[in-house]
């Protein structure tokens, strides 16, 4: 499509499509900057791009929130231009043969909880938490998680009066059935607790490779959602989280114990996973599963895996977003993903480093993307009335919050800017002041087991790991 929108954004190749429109790669003809352009027919039956653009505007400034560059109407289309981002969690999950190890999941969980918390603090529920809606950044932001796709987001309280939306029943299912909370299946109005329960399912999906209610067959979409709901309700969290650390069970017991209007204890949830991360002896080095696949030399110097992989595939570059995801895992999913993205992988590599294993700093404005149209087979259902009754919202006993006591200070809910400057290597090879003082390892170089102790010999590995987590939330809330 040879078209310019917003006076300066030329549309390139199509990145994806979905029920709400199409996503294109775009280029700012004045600066050469690559962007993501989302188009929606202006005469769409249920237009939502204008609403979504307003959400982007209201959320601007938060860490992991794409920058809205322009919104308007061009001919027969509503158009929204935002930052171009890297691959989604679903893409990376496929790239890693549909399984993440514990270390990768814990590093992602901390950032993902922060993203959900930020939206809640700004007065909105996301209501479609799933792997497709969390993307990695590009260039200097390659280790930063972004949250996208606010088309189903809903305001749950007034920021002036702080009045919460009322409790309601008989609501239609909004979101993706695979990750929807039990109460959402039962037709109960969603609140903050539901976003967090959905996030818990995403984390278990990463660890397990699939969820117990995937692949259920039914004659109609409604029957399928009912089967998913039943299986989800009949699967105890202890069974869902079996063979994994008890912190994941504690997470579910806590979020399911929340009442409709309760404010979640986000620091407690993050502390659960931070303490587990430290107890496992992991290094906070930003070496994810896909980092090892891309640069195998990282594997020998990093504690990235809780269990060694039987074999490492050839180093390849992570995929960029795609439009459709498989509903069921397959044995060759990882290789299929690599083959499918062969051309696009090279583009990602050019932004995030060469095959030498050293990621070069991107001195231009960080490019970011939105895979707003990615979806699984469990798509947002059509309207239908729910007949199930709500489950009890009685809070669980306090035993559900038996977390390992930690010295981590409770992170302020207003601290949302992650300091990434300490993890960038300038092209001249010199470390910045932030790099010399913040004790965060550079993810673009091979991790060293003694790198922390040289910088601060009097501090324990636990203290330094905790500081690495805290740096994720230290800041003034301004976009960097």
UniProtKB/Swiss-Prot annotation:
Chain ranges passing through the membrane: none
For this protein, the record's InterPro entries field holds: CK1_Ser-Thr_kinase (IPR050235), Kinase-like_dom_sf (IPR011009), Prot_kinase_dom (IPR000719), Protein_kinase_ATP_BS (IPR017441), Ser/Thr_kinase_AS (IPR008271)
Q: Which residues are the active-site ones?
A: 128 (proton acceptor)
Q: What is its EC number?
A: 2.7.11.1
Q: What quaternary structure, including any partners, is listed in this protein's UniProt entry?
A: Monomer.
Task: Please give the GO cellular component terms listed in this UniProt entry.
Answer: cytoplasm; plasmodesma
Keywords, A to Z? ATP-binding, Cell junction, Cytoplasm, Kinase, Nucleotide-binding, Serine/threonine-protein kinase, Transferase
Record's compositionally biased regions (Polar residues)? 369-383, 422-438
The Protein kinase domain, residue ranges: 9-278
Q: Which SUPFAM superfamilies match?
A: Protein kinase-like (PK-like)
Q: What's its catalytic activity?
A: L-seryl-[protein] + ATP = O-phospho-L-seryl-[protein] + ADP + H(+); L-threonyl-[protein] + ATP = O-phospho-L-threonyl-[protein] + ADP + H(+)
Pfam families associated with the record: Pkinase
Which Gene Ontology MF annotations are present? Answer: ATP binding; protein serine kinase activity; protein serine/threonine kinase activity
Organism encoding this protein: Arabidopsis thaliana
Q: Which family does it belong to?
A: Belongs to the protein kinase superfamily. CK1 Ser/Thr protein kinase family. Casein kinase I subfamily.
- Write down the superkingdom of origin: Eukaryota
Name used for this protein in its record: Casein kinase 1-like protein 8
Low complexity: which segments have biased composition? Answer: 299-311, 395-414, 443-459
Per UniProt, ATP binds at: 15-23, 38
Q: Briefly, what is this protein's role? A: Casein kinases are operationally defined by their preferential utilization of acidic proteins such as caseins as substrates. It can phosphorylate a large number of proteins.
Annotated spans, Disordered = 298-461
Posttranslational modification = Autophosphorylated.
Cellular localization per UniProt: Cytoplasm; Cell junction, Plasmodesma
Q: Which gene encodes it?
A: CKL8
């Amino acid at each position: 499509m040879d078209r310019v929108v917003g006076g300066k954004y030329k549309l390139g190749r199509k990145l994806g499509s979905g029920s709400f429109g199409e996503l294109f790669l775009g280029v700012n003809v004045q600066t050469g900057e690559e962007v993501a352009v989302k188009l929606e027919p202006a005469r769409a039956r249920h237009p939502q791009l204008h609403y979504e653009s307003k959400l982007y505007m209201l959320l601007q400034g938060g860490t992991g929130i794409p920058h809205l560059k322009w919104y308007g109407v061009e001919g027969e289309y509503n158009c929204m231009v935002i930052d171009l981002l890297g691959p989604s969690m679903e893409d990376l999950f496929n790239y890693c043969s549909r399984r993440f190890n514990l270390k990768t999941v814990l590093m992602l969980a901390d950032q993902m909880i922060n993203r959900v918390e930020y939206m809640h603090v700004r007065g909105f529920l996301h209501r479609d938490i799933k792997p497709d809606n969390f993307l990695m950044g590009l260039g200097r932001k390659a280790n930063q998680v972004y949250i996208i796709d606010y088309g189903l987001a809903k305001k749950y309280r007034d920021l002036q009066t702080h009045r919460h939306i009322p409790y309601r029943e008989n609501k239609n299912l909004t979101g993706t059935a695979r990750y929807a909370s039990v109460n959402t299946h039962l037709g109960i109005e969603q609140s903050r607790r539901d976003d967090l329960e959905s996030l818990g399912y995403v984390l278990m999906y990463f660890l397990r490779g699939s969820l117990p209610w995937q692949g259920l067959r039914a004659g109609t979409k409604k029957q399928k959602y009912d089967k998913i709901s039943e299986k989800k309700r009949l699967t105890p969290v202890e069974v869902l989280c079996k063979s994994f650390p008890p912190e994941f069970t504690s997470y579910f017991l806590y979020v399911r114990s929340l009442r409709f209007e309760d404010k979640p204890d986000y620091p407690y949830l993050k502390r659960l996973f931070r303490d587990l991360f430290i107890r496992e002896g992991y290094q906070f080095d930003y070496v994810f599963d896909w980092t090892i696949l891309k640069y195998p030399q990282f594997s020998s110097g990093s504690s990235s895996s809780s269990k060694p992989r039987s074999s490492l595939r050839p180093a390849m570059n992570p995929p960029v977003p795609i439009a459709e995801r498989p509903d069921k895992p397959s044995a060759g999913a990882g290789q299929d993903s690599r083959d499918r993205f062969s051309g696009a992988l090279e583009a990602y590599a050019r932004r995030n480093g060469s095959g030498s294993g050293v990621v070069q700093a991107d001195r231009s404005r960080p490019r970011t993307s939105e895979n707003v149209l990615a979806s699984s087979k469990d798509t947002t259902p059509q309207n239908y009335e729910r007949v199930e009754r709500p489950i009890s919202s009685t809070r669980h006993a306090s035993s559900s919050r038996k977390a390992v006591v930690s010295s981590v200070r409770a992170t302020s809910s207003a601290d949302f800017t992650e300091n990434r400057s300490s993890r960038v290597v300038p092209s001249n090879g010199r470390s910045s002041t932030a790099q010399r003082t913040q004790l965060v390892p550079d993810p673009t170089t091979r991790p060293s087991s003694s790198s922390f102790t040289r910088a601060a010999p009097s501090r324990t590995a636990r203290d330094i790991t905790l500081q690495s987590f805290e740096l994720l939330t230290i800041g003034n809330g301004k976009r960097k």
